[in-house]
């Protein structure tokens, strides 16, 4: 069996194990065993991929395999990875692993919750290993469908409204995406849906002009592209902790990954035609998301709008179409995925104790729960780009690469986008100063306890990942840059 298929097989076996589990301890055992296997598999795959590249492997995708699924439409189960998908698999496995511990005490319906959570994970892993357009779309839908129940049943606040809004908007984006994929298939005339074969065929310019915006918009909705981002803050705010972690940390990255891997790679002329239009929208996303975070008072909404800004920066960097900016975009996906997972984990732990996310009702938490408070400070410092943490490496690579474009329009957009650095500092320092320091105003909060062992373990794992990427970014950027080059070389400026 191909090693990549294990990323689908293991979650499927986890689903079976969860189905037959008879109590909460067995459910936890299945989740810990399965998520640990996935993390170990992702680490092994990363090391193997680097080893094969160093040994001289030149193929664009490694560990490839293809099985005919439906011959009349040339649909195959085709898998393969390059440096981009390898780091996305590693990110996904880290968040699934830590999300398991962040949900350790979740009630009620623990078994059913983890069933849907694992199905969501299956879709995410399957999407990143797929090289067939239809298979990729299928896994994309598998990843979206569980979100409705995970938010609608186990969420909080206006959970039914948030779940329905998220589902309708993302399914609307999927409709555009499906039309775009069919346009690529018929336009290429390749009699295959394999990305590696389609890219060898030239799709007519007029078809690219029509179908590029459909594919980019279809994925862009999931990437919180302005003005189609409104589902994201409500969805984040209402979702349970681990779902918020996976949603913001990984699911939104499917949007940026799809825009780069499918829309821009397969339709480079369309990217040249529409690039400046979408660049304006992404610039607005970056700045608007930051300003929106400044005026929020709910911790989850603050982080949700921060995610809109940071995910907008991913699409912004991709549309700059330079090798350095594209490398920065992938680093930003990885960095933001880890940072926002850490944020949502900590927010969930604080909310579980205080039963409020309103920063006006929180203060003095540094003395009451120092571990969680220090974790929040580290997450905040990473988010505002402190050197030595992941945010600095990613954002500087994005802005340096973006400024390499010599024309006035692109440099103006870059200068506007850099405002997000200052805006981020404003809302992060505001929240840290408000909730962690000062005198505790609520006597009931003085009785609260700090993080438990399972919570500490999840937080420490994420902090290590954030610090590791910030202190030793070379190995990640080296893996990414080699895979960015073939896609960038396709693009027309």
Predicted segments — roles?
Residues 2-3, 18-101, 105-115, 191-197, ...:
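Transmembrane helix-loop-helix hairpins at membrane boundaries of multipass inner-membrane proteins
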Residues 5-20, 32-45, 89-103, 120-122, ...:
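Central hydrophobic cores of alpha-helical transmembrane segments in multi-pass inner-membrane proteins
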Residues 33-50, 170-181, 372, 376-384, ...:
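Hydrophobic alpha-helical membrane-insertion segments
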Residues 98-104, 122-134, 147-434:
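Hydrophobic transmembrane alpha-helices and their helix-loop junctions in integral membrane proteins
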Residues 369-371, 428-493:
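Cytoplasmic/organellar membrane-interface segments at the starts of transmembrane helices
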């Amino acid at each position: 069996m191909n090693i990549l298929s294990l990323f689908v097989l293991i979650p499927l076996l986890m689903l079976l194990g969860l189905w037959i589990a008879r109590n909460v301890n067995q459910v936890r055992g299945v989740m810990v065993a399965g998520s640990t296997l996935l993390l170990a598999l992702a680490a092994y795959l990363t090391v193997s991929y680097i080893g094969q590249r160093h040994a001289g492997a030149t193929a664009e995708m490694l560990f490839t395999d293809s099985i005919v699924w439906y011959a009349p439409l040339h649909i195959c189960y085709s898998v393969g990875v390059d440096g981009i998908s390898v780091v996305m698999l590693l990110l996904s496995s880290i968040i699934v692993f830590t999300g398991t511990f962040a949900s350790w005490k979740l009630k009620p319906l623990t078994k059913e919750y983890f069933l849907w959570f694992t199905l969501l994970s299956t879709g995410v892993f399957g999407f990143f290993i797929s090289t067939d357009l239809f298979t990729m779309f299928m896994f994309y839908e598998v990843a979206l469908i569980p979100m409705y129940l995970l938010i609608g049943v186990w969420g909080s606040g206006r959970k039914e409204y948030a779940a329905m809004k998220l589902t309708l908007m993302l399914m609307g984006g999927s409709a555009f995406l499906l039309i775009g994929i069919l346009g690529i298939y018929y336009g290429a005339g390749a009699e295959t849906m394999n990305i590696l074969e389609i890219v060898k065929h030239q799709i007519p310019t007029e078809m690219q002009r029509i179908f590029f915006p459909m594919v980019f918009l279809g994925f862009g909705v999931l990437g919180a592209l302005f003005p189609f981002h409104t589902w994201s803050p409500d969805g984040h705010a209402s979702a349970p902790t681990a779902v918020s972690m996976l949603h913001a940390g990984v699911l939104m990255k499917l949007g940026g990954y799809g825009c780069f891997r499918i829309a821009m790679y397969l339709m480079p002329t369309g990217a040249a035609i529409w690039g400046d239009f979408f660049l304006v929208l992404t610039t607005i996303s970056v700045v608007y998301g930051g300003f929106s975070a400044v005026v929020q008072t709910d911790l989850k909404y603050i982080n949700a709008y921060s995610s809109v800004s940071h995910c907008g920066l991913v699409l912004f960097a991709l549309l700059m179409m330079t090798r350095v900016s594209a490398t920065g975009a992938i680093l930003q996906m990885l960095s933001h995925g880890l940072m926002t997972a850490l944020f949502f984990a900590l927010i969930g732990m604080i909310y579980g104790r205080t039963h409020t996310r309103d920063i006006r009702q929180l203060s003095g938490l540094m003395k009451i729960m120092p571990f969680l408070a220090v974790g929040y400070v580290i997450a905040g410092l990473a988010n505002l780009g402190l050197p030595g943490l992941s945010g600095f490496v990613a954002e500087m690579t994005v802005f340096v690469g973006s400024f390499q474009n010599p024309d006035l329009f692109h440099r103006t957009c870059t200068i506007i986008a850099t405002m997000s650095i200052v805006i981020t500092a404003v809302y992060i320092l505001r929240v840290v100063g408000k909730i962690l320091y000062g005198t505790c105003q609520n006597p009931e909060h003085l009785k609260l306890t700090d993080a438990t062992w399972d919570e500490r373990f999840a937080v420490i794992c994420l902090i290590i990942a954030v610090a590791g990427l910030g202190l030793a970014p070379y190995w990640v950027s080296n893996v990414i840059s080699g895979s960015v080059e073939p896609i960038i070389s396709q693009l027309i400026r």
